[in-house]
């Protein structure tokens, strides 16, 4: 399975970033291409993307104590985003590891571009909220 990682420093405390990552209602504030999020079935949420308002993307959001990770998984494509936060001078470090199933491998570069834009926006929004 293809995978990649991205990392950025953030001038906000980890708690501010955690709030954005853990609250699906706030995804449109920072997740590139996300138009809106609605409650889904069984604790999942449904993301709707810019330009694709009629294509639901069921999404699971879970947190793991070990590694202090938030895992956001698209239940349609099985693309998994694992976000981790670490304390750093003046704020925190934000890292994301993305795993793409072989069936979706052709989407590697578009997903990487989306993640880079999302990470930059996440850091910006968290910093503004701090």
Question: Where in this protein do the model-derived segments appear?
Answer:
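Beta-strand/loop substructures that line and gate deep hydrophobic ligand-binding cavities in soluble
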Residues: 71-128
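Short, low-complexity, polar/charged sequence segments that are solvent-exposed and flexible
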Residues: 25-29, 38-39, 65-68, 90-94, ...
């Amino acid at each position: 399975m293809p995978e990649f990682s991205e990392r950025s420093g953030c001038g906000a405390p980890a708690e501010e970033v955690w709030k954005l990552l853990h609250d699906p209602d706030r995804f449109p504030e920072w997740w590139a291409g996300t138009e809106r999020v609605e409650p889904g079935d069984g604790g999942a949420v449904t993301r709707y993307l810019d330009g694709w308002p009629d294509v639901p993307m069921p999404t699971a959001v879970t947190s793991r104590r070990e590694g202090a990770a938030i895992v956001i998984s698209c239940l349609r494509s099985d693309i998994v985003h694992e976000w981790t936060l670490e304390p750093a001078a003046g704020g925190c470090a934000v890292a994301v590891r993305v795993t793409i199933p072989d069936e979706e491998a052709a989407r590697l570069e578009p997903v990487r571009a989306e993640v880079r834009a999302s990470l930059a926006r996440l850091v910006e929004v968290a910093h503004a909220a701090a």
